[in-house]
Amino acid sequence: MMGFEWGFKPSSKITQSTVSSQGTGNVMIPTAGVKQKRRYANEEQEEEELPRNKNVMKYGGVSKRRPQPGSLIRGQPLPLQRGMELMNKNQLQQLLVDLMTKHPEIQQSVHTRVIGLDFSIQKCLDMLKQKSEAVYQSIPYNRSYESNKLDDYAFVRMKPQILEFLNCLVDFILDNIPPRLENLHASLKFLDICTELVIKLPRFELASNNYYYDKCIEQLSHVWCTLIEHVARDRIILLADNSSVWKSHMTRLQVYNEHSNGLLERPLQLFKSLDMGSPSAASSSTLSLQESIIYHHDTMTANENNNNSGSAATDSPFN
């Protein structure tokens, strides 16, 4: 009977030399030569498996494949168009201002594109109402604006919002009068609403804190006179339009003049000099209006000279 085979088949020579002829029964007894050959075979097998298991021993018994760099997907920023779609209005505006500051040569191109756009009057009014609301929201909670006696602390808190609103108002008015806008009715209506917004702003107890309001109303008075001059020169509008339209503007202007302590007296007198009756009356009223306009321009020029010679506030938007 044959014994165990330890992974290989022994040759006939080793079998003959390792089996005793008698006295041991039928059991094979391996000799020293068999043990040595088996040890050499085991060592060769271990040497073959050693490079294969090198990484396994190095990483604590866990074999890992090294990732190939070409097979990974790397993150990347958004394209310019997608990024701009996600930016809000303030971010886009700040980006444009920064670009024009760093590259002044593009300011003219941007300005040309902007003035070529046709912004509706309603859009301008919506913006003005937002900025007017910001003025009211900046009032300190412990002071009531209904009494028109806000203190110095309230003026310091509200000043940035007031200047922003008045600057925006002046810019929009200049963009909605001739020759930018040829429709005199639309210009007068827009100026009427803007005047009402300024008149209704909360005022301060100290007269010097109301300087920006008063200065703005003076400028609005000049704009009123300018539009009335355009109306007087266009006799077709004077004769064709219903007189109730002009009387409505005059009535509202009279209310504004009372609330502004007479700062709108000059355009009010020009309106009263208009006669919406017969053509002869209209022509005579035009002559009297022209005399008033000459006086108005002389007064406006004198005021501008006084402002330039005097010490005006450096942050005023109306100088």
Swiss-Prot record:
The keyword Endoplasmic reticulum does not apply. GO terms for cellular component: cytoplasm; nucleus. It comes from the Eukaryota. It holds the Pfam family Cut8. Residues 33-76 are annotated as: Disordered. Keywords: Cytoplasm, Nucleus, Protein transport, Transport. One of its GO terms (biological process) is nuclear protein quality control by the ubiquitin-proteasome system. Present with 2120 molecules/cell in log phase SD medium. Involved in ubiquitin-mediated protein degradation. Regulatory factor in the ubiquitin/proteasome pathway that controls the turnover of proteasome substrates. Targets proteasomes to the nucleus and facilitates the degradation of nuclear proteins. Required for efficient chromosome segregation. Restores protein transport and ribosomal RNA stability. Binds the proteasome. Interacts with karyopherin SRP1 and proteasome subunit RPN11. This is Tethering factor for nuclear proteasome STS1.
